[in-house]
Amino acid sequence: MAKYEKLIPRFLEYITTETRSDENATTIPSTQTQVVFLHKLMDDLKEIGLSDVKYNEKNGYVTALLPSNIDKKVPTMGFLSHVDTADFNAKGVNPQTIENYDGESIIKLDEAGQFVLDPKEFPNMKNYKGQTLITTDGSTLLGSDDKSGVAEIITAMDYFIQHPEIKHGDIKIGLGPDEEIGTGADHFDAEDFATDFAYTMDGGPIGQLEYETFNAAAMKVDIQGKNVHPSEAKDIMINALQVAVDFQDAFPRDEVPEKTDGRQGFYHLLSLDGTVDEAHMAYIIRDFDRDGLETRKAFAAKVAEDMNAKYGEGRVKATIKDQYYNMAEVLKDHMDVVDLAKDAMEAIDIKPLIEPVRGGTDGSKISFMGIPTPNIFAGAENMHGRYEFVSVQTMEKAVDTMIKMNELNVERN
């Protein structure tokens, strides 16, 4: 019998509910499916016996409290995860379970075998010999990012309630929307959450522990062309699409996601659409160093300036907006929070994998709101697409880690 017998049933139930976020929406949360799912989670939290379960209409967060069962006061710990999934088909998720995976075989996702998980293409599969994997059927993403985290947090709280002999302080949990579109934590109420520190359960493989993220900005580029009939176009037409091509060509070709790793930053063209008359581009700009981000933003603004000098003032409008900052700026003064997670992992024979996140987490913003919030593994591999999978054993270890962190929090305070 599984140690956490409701963990996987919860997860499988959650991933079959479609909860994609929508970056073009103006509501909070961005989609009604998230609202419905969050209210369902409220019922689950009440059912297991958590206190102060509530939904915040202003930010879309469901929060709850597991009251302390000890006499002394220890720091209040929080756990956070997000309910939305990435911009890939998430309707009709049909998970497959592969027991005792041998670490070598190709896993056929769809019946026709058009989509497969091949260890030659995905060498991370070799790490899961002997484990139970949950995959997609090739037509959707899985939603392990981050419904693994949701299921793990609720399971850990349920386990504490069922095992009062395990001593713990106050624990707050927060389940929120819209992380995938980068706005979920914008309106997070840190004062109401009121923890001394927290962890997002939103990482990947076992042992992952992250307290460094990118500094991030987004850029939207609007280009106004001049359209006339091609027969009369000489020295008159300004093709907005050609301007867009020239704009993109001005950026360093090797400073893109597909050619960078480690601590290297990048410029990433997300979308380009338009006509001869007008074109629109969307970029993200990333760098681990705050000064590096400012340098990249200045470069992008200079490209727009150069395009206007070439094609006429006002043709190109670049709007650059900061998104989040490297939470290491905060965590460097709170390394005890990182060490607590690291020590908990080591105590249960997990090797911590401490590395910078080539992305961001909700903790990137929440840390700057006064709650130091590193990121911990939740199990998802190959996130955001049809090749996503998760190990049952990794999910169980994530729950183990949360429990051990709380035990250490009591012992050390």
Curated annotation (Swiss-Prot):
Q: Where in the cell is it found?
A: Cytoplasm
Matching entries from PROSITE patterns are given as: ARGE_DAPE_CPG2_2
A family per Pfam: M20_dimer
Cofactor note text? Binds 2 Zn(2+) ions per subunit.
- E.C. number(s) listed in UniProt: 3.4.11.4
Q: Name one GO biological process term.
A: proteolysis
- List the protein's name: Peptidase T
